Amino acid sequence: MKIYLVGGAVRDQLLGLPVKDRDWIVVGADPATLLSLGYQQVGKDFPVFLNPKTKEEYALARTERKSSTGYTGFICDFSPTITLEQDLIRRDLTINAMAQSEDGEIIDPYGGKQDLENRILRHISPAFSEDPLRVLRVARFAARYHSLGFKIASETLALMAELAQSGELQHLTAERVWLETEKALNEKNPEIYFETLHKTGALSVLFSEIDALHGVPNPVKHHPEVDSFIHTMLVLKQAVNLTENNPILNKSAVRFAAICHDLGKALTPQNILPHHYGHEQAGIKPTRSLCKRLKVPSYFQELAELTCEFHTHIHKAFELRAETVITLFNRFDVWRKSQRFQEFLQVCLADTRGRTGFENKDYPQIDYINQLLHAANEVDVQQVIADGFEKQAIKNELTKRRILAVKQTKTNYPTN
């Protein structure tokens, strides 16, 4: 029996990156052997065992043979005769198909180390096409390692495009698509994930609402980048910058809202382009459709829909009447969900800066709207009750006093 460290741990170690998870492969053993050594079996589909001391995962070496459509349609062989090389070749990319022996030797039968040095994401064999999930995984790796200069090999991109056209992607479950997408949203360059999926044709299959933004123009005065998809990717990049070092915000939810904020522009009638009157309200339906299909968590969906509807309110914050401001606060339920409103404001800032040449633009609207929020929050509901108001009258009086507080703050707010 031999044990090897495999996959991401070896890859990241060679890249000089911190190793998060360590996966191990056991060659020349069967389940009974590991159980006798105190390992605990946790996998039903695949024999995976927890080390009794470290609790790290150890899997028996295996081969896979395609038996039906989708990413689950495989027949696996876990016999003790399976070699390390046979196990490694079933993996997706050469950089993920390296192993390290217990004495520290790197086993690299498929050129992963060379591809690491050359910053190439390359598939190992034509068997890559047997698992449609790999299209998303490779796009996610491209997002993760883009800042290190990694590119996808042209032949791998071609295979990904073939998979996108084959109909295999439709067999992926919503949960798997969302899991990969949420992971991608947390990478350093999530825009590369979506750009890669567009390049391969997978975006139109899995994220048609986002893909529909391609080629939709904006007024060049406000959007020098013109194209709505390009703008959305720039907004996503800005959202990454704004959330990267902010542990309070739900960064993947903010980034998802950034992607959805202008989905309504794809529905703008041709005769009024490049203007997009009413795109805010129009964006709710495609956002809801996307979220329902991919079973996106409700928190993400709520933030994305609210962002679609109200992002231009913040752009025009200085023009809003006090009554409109309180209506906005009520819609976001800022009284109980203050963090969600702050996440929304970050998307609005990302939207302003996600335009060519506007990357460092000041956005005083956030300070202004937060001052109005502070004023509204200072209104004491207990005082309203103490003043003798009851039932529905409490709510009406509370709203009235909040509007008055906002009006006073607006009057006193410095205009320059």
Curated annotation (Swiss-Prot):
Catalyzes the addition and repair of the essential 3'-terminal CCA sequence in tRNAs without using a nucleic acid template. Adds these three nucleotides in the order of C, C, and A to the tRNA nucleotide-73, using CTP and ATP as substrates and producing inorganic pyrophosphate. tRNA 3'-terminal CCA addition is required both for tRNA processing and repair. Also involved in tRNA surveillance by mediating tandem CCA addition to generate a CCACCA at the 3' terminus of unstable tRNAs. While stable tRNAs receive only 3'-terminal CCA, unstable tRNAs are marked with CCACCA and rapidly degraded. Its EC number is 2.7.7.72, 3.1.3.-, 3.1.4.-. NCBIfam families: PRK10885.1. PANTHER family: MULTIFUNCTIONAL CCA PROTEIN (PTHR47545:SF1). Belongs to the tRNA nucleotidyltransferase/poly(A) polymerase family. Bacterial CCA-adding enzyme type 1 subfamily. The keyword Nucleotide-binding applies. Comprises two domains: an N-terminal domain containing the nucleotidyltransferase activity and a C-terminal HD domain associated with both phosphodiesterase and phosphatase activities. Pfam families: HD, PolyA_pol, PolyA_pol_RNAbd. Its cofactor is Mg(2+); Ni(2+). It comes from the Bacteria. It catalyses: a tRNA precursor + 2 CTP + ATP = a tRNA with a 3' CCA end + 3 diphosphate; a tRNA with a 3' CCA end + 2 CTP + ATP = a tRNA with a 3' CCACCA end + 3 diphosphate. This is Multifunctional CCA protein. GO terms for molecular function: ATP binding; CCA tRNA nucleotidyltransferase activity; cyclic-nucleotide phosphodiesterase activity; magnesium ion binding; phosphatase activity; tRNA binding. Residues 228-335 form the HD domain. Mg(2+) binds at residues 21, 23. ATP binds at residues 8, 11, 91, 137, 140. One of its GO terms (biological process) is RNA repair.
